[in-house]
Design a protein with these regions (language model features):
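Short loop/helix-cap segments at secondary-structure boundaries that form the rim of catalytic
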Residues: 14-18, 35, 57-58
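Short glycine-rich, Thr/Ser-proximal phosphate-binding strand/loop in the N-terminal lobe
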Residues: 20-37, 120-123
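Anionic-ligand binding patches
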Residues: 3-4, 40-224
Length: 224
């Protein structure tokens, strides 16, 4: 049995490496346009599921395919607004101004498919993200690094200088793009026990004391 990660995200590779599972990276190309009236949770879950099926083309029967999709979501006039990757520095700057000093949500769908099965196991992780009141000068300096341009919402929670988030109370790895406790739970349902304590490895690597991992691993849903 091989483990395949259907993703070209370096952050997802970095996070999955913490598990000490041996895996191979494959492409999981899908159409990422939301469907009409599709909720954010439905959107990321659908894309994660579709990515596993796309990635399955690179494996053999019995192999496991992991995939995830993450969306930064804000609300405007009561409607969900998905913030993708900025097209340029101007849009990155605009997103950072918009998010400053406010709380938005990050949704990640994660799915695991055993090749040969019809459908993957899947779940959604949701994290409330409180952005700090960073200055205009900090925005300009961060945008000048180019880092926001390949990030949904135009920021990386783990950036060592900008540090855009404060007082996070949810899953940090989710905001980076791969909620490891949700993945662990799905893998164990597949009969695959991680070779290491993923929760400890995640917290140590990210420098974050996670207050929710035990509830997630036990199957508690933190958001309705």
């Amino acid at each position: 049995m091989r483990l395949l990660l259907a993703s070209n995200s370096p952050r997802r590779r970095e996070l999955l490496n913490l598990s000490q599972w041996s895996f191979q990276v494959v492409m999981g190309e899908v159409n990422e346009h939301p469907l009409p009236s599709e909720r954010s949770s439905e959107y990321v879950l659908r894309l994660a599921q579709e990515k596993t099926k796309s990635g399955a083309a690179h494996g053999n029967v019995g192999d496991l395919v992991i995939a995830a999709d993450t969306a930064v979501v804000d609300r405007e006039n009561g409607a969900e607004l998905i913030l993708g990757k900025p097209q340029d520095a101007l849009e990155a700057r605009s997103m950072l101004y918009w998010l400053r000093g406010r709380v938005h949500r990050v949704y990640s769908g994660v799915a695991v498919l055993r090749i040969g099965d019809i459908n993957p196991l899947s779940d959604v992780c949701i994290t409330d993200v409180p952005m700090r009141n960073y200055s205009d000068e900090e925005i300009e300096a961060y945008v000048a690094t180019g880092d926001p341009l390949d990030k949904a919402g135009a920021y990386a929670i783990q950036h060592p200088v900008f540090k855009p988030v404060e007082r996070l109370q949810g899953c940090y790895a989710n905001v980076m793009g791969l909620p490891l406790c949700h993945l662990t739970r799905l893998m164990m349902q597949m009969g695959e026990t991680p070779p290491t304590d993923i929760t400890a490895a995640c917290q140590q690597a990210l420098g974050y004391h996670c207050p929710v991992y035990a509830k997630i691993l036990s199957g508690v849903r933190l958001y309705k």
